[in-house]
Amino acid sequence: MAQLYYKKVNYSPYRDRIPLQIVRAETELSAEEKAFLNAVEKGDYATVKQALQEAEIYYNVNINCMDPLGRSALLIAIENENLEIMELLLNHSVYVGDALLYAIRKEVVGAVELLLSYRKPSGEKQVPTLMMDTQFSEFTPDITPIMLAAHTNNYEIIKLLVQKRVTIPRPHQIRCNCVECVSSSEVDSLRHSRSRLNIYKALASPSLIALSSEDPILTAFRLGWELKELSKVENEFKAEYEELSQQCKLFAKDLLDQARSSRELEIILNHRDDHSEELDPQKYHDLAKLKVAIKYHQKEFVAQPNCQQLLATLWYDGFPGWRRKHWVVKLLTCMTIGFLFPMLSIAYLISPRSNLGLFIKKPFIKFICHTASYLTFLFMLLLASQHIVRTDLHVQGPPPTVVEWMILPWVLGFIWGEIKEMWDGGFTEYIHDWWNLMDFAMNSLYLATISLKIVAYVKYNGSRPREEWEMWHPTLIAEALFAISNILSSLRLISLFTANSHLGPLQISLGRMLLDILKFLFIYCLVLLAFANGLNQLYFYYETRAIDEPNNCKGIRCEKQNNAFSTLFETLQSLFWSVFGLLNLYVTNVKARHEFTEFVGATMFGTYNVISLVVLLNMLIAMMNNSYQLIADHADIEWKFARTKLWMSYFDEGGTLPPPFNIIPSPKSFLYLGNWFNNTFCPKRDPDGRRRRHNLRSFTERHADSLIQNQHYQEVIRNLVKRYVAAMIRNSKTNEGLTEENFKELKQDISSFRYEVLDLLGNRKQPRRSLSTSSTELSQRDDTNDGSGGARAKSKSVSFNLGCKKKACHGPPLIRTMPRASGAQGKSKAESSSKRSFMGPSLKKLGLLFSKFNGHMSEPSSEPMYTISDGIVQQHYMWQDIRYSQMEKGKAEACSQSEINLSEVELGEVRGAAQSSECPLTCSSSLHCASSICSSNSKLLDSSEDVFETWGEACDLLMHKWGDGQEEQVTTRL
């Protein structure tokens, strides 16, 4: 390893060490820039403002500098939610860059408002984008503010951006092959996929859908379905797209949760999209929205309790309190209606609008009648299989029996019902239901059976022993197909289990297991074909004839199995039945003494059994267990969705009569047929004006009804959205709890409040100078208290340099002594003192006042020290804690006993580069002088004449208490 760093390892003194260094070093910040960013971090408004002002004059600070984390001052202010410093930085034209995106990600609403209202000043020089490190940006180029806000799902920020009329790129179709999609995918496929994912992630935001969509429920339906289909195409991001699809489904369900009355629920579920092609625009109150939800597989929406409550009310219409009745009463009621279904059907045929005719149209009654009709059909199939009517078994073309004649109307009724369903719903919707495919297979088998029986009846008239019939005799094939159709007819009854809460989940689990079996069969057939081909190739040469076998029997069905692998078909059968243990091992033996061939054959046969039984069969069991567990975890939702589909099939108009009564033409059917024939072949001579008026009237009525329905729907949606947003914000605040961000905000608030208090006490901010006492009165009070000290203060002056351009303040130490104040002075001295600068006595009073506030009131024997630049009271023995222990004790005592005369202070540059070693230098630059209460003496010197007037009385009181018994000593260093 050391050879990677040194060429000559043997002669290296550090050959047993690996040297480390920073290979990707970044530009280090200067002390001023570090102090500037530190002030922004702590919320020190005054220091930040001073640094910005100095940067405009001296260019000693890069206001767009970044810390090691890549955060500029503006981003730090956004992270700390310090809007005052943000506004200050924006007023000084800092580089904004991705600040808006950063504020959106941090969900700082105030910062977003401030940045949206920010306008770059005209004529100002802005930092060009190319000068910034674009590769270090945390956001990809395709991310826009509205997309990022939608990703965070912050309702307030999304609302602010939508009010600015922002836009989102419209995603192309899933399998779009346009020039733009093809070229984008070829240039950078990762960026193309990521960009599509970011767009859909933004579009799937519940807050964005609630704000910008006229029909948020329908938008969630379509978007969820599109995302589900997209997950099948974009396999790399399948989990992300499925999560977004589930998010859309939950949003639609949560929106429906906010419905508070049956009226609102009916308006939502009966609303129809005018642009929808799959629904008839002439029908109203047909649960159109619920049909769309079923079409898009919105299981959560359909299984929502409010929706199920309305469906149950419609389903049990005419049977109030049905669920509260005893199960015996329910059973007797259903059996009674079931036995009466022929009479109810005949009553409907004769008079559809009578009481009995309207009674059978109720969904629950219709369901019972159809179930009773199907059970009757199964009973007749049972009678047909038992051969109650005896016939000659050796007749090649037997005529139909009485039971078969009774079965025929039911078969025709089933076929007619399937034709009507395919005509009403369309072929695509018809084949999407697996039960329809099963019905199609069952009806096809019945038709084939009837056709073959007719052929046998016409072609074969004689009687012949059945053992002598050929293998493909029509009667034999018809009997086989009829047996298969009987099995399918009996299994079709499982679909009715969905109506029961106990059998429904089991029926759904069975359907999922069938899918697992199909997946398993695909792999199993591949293994079966592979071993069948190998074994057939090995044993093909050892095939024997039937006459050479016992009892002239050849194959695995013989008493002694033989020739199990002689042909490919026989090999496939043998391997299949071996899974169930029905094949013996001696089938791998051959009559010749070819032991190697027998060994290879037995090994291949054993390997097949290990793979099929141990591996594949256990894999199938695991898959079926997983499918059952998946249904069991969501049993309630899956069952309610399946039950709703069953109920909806009986809510629709049509299909009222069960088989076989549905094939009987009703008077209503004759009326409809007559009207169609009359309008088609015998049109009446009607003036064009009358026809146009009729069309205009009907169009106006439909349009008015549509407008009224849409207005009611929009009112309900508006209320639902308001309730949803309120609940979302309330839940987010409840679930959030105390996080690390809350403690950071609290820390920042405390820090900002601290500096605000310091500014208030130190009067560092210009806007807060609202004082009442005049400077003349303050000077008079000061001269009165100072006594003869004021005369000495006239000859002394101190200069402060505000613009320290280097890291250390250059200039000699300004240390002076000031005796204790004596008695009151005369009027002339007061007048002369009022003409002087007010800052000297005021600063002296403030120094004493701050020391009093800080709790550093020293005992008479101690000698306290005060540094105005730091505002921290320090004892002389504390110098060792701040790395000045090397100072001599005598110099330290001299420094502690020295005083400064602050009667006259002038603004200007401190001339001279010599620096004193007697007193420690407390600050290295103007940015580092804001560490405590009086953080910046330069800020104090910038104050106007009225700054210190409000502190006059408090300072006088402290001066009297302080002056009794000890000498005032103040030490300052700049």
From Swiss-Prot:
Molecular-function GO term, any one: calcium channel activity
Regulation: Activated by G-protein coupled receptors via direct interaction with GTP-bound GNAI3, which increases the channel sensitivity to phosphatidylinositol bisphosphate. May be activated by intracellular calcium store depletion. Calcium channel activity is enhanced by MYLK, that promotes its subcellular localization at the plasma membrane.
Tissues in which the UniProt entry reports expression: Expressed in brain.
Keyword Cell membrane: yes
Bilayer-crossing regions: 364-384, 405-419, 434-454, 477-497, 513-535, 604-624
Catalysed conversion reaction: Ca(2+)(in) = Ca(2+)(out)
Glycosylation: residue positions: 461
Family annotation (InterPro entries): Ankyrin_rpt (IPR002110), Ankyrin_rpt-contain_sf (IPR036770), Ion_trans_dom (IPR005821), TRP_dom (IPR013555), TRPC5_channel (IPR005461), TRPC_channel (IPR002153)
Entry's Gene Ontology BP terms: neuron apoptotic process; phosphatidylserine exposure on apoptotic cell surface; regulation of cytosolic calcium ion concentration
Segments annotated as ANK repeats: 30-60, 69-97, 98-124, 141-170
Xref: SMART domains: ANK (SM00248), TRP_2 (SM01420)
Compartment(s): Cell membrane
Extracellular side stretches: 385-404, 455-476, 536-603
NCBIfam families per UniProt: trp
Family the entry assigns: Belongs to the transient receptor (TC 1.A.4) family. STrpC subfamily. TRPC5 sub-subfamily.
UniProt protein name: Short transient receptor potential channel 5
Encoding gene, per UniProt annotation: TRPC5
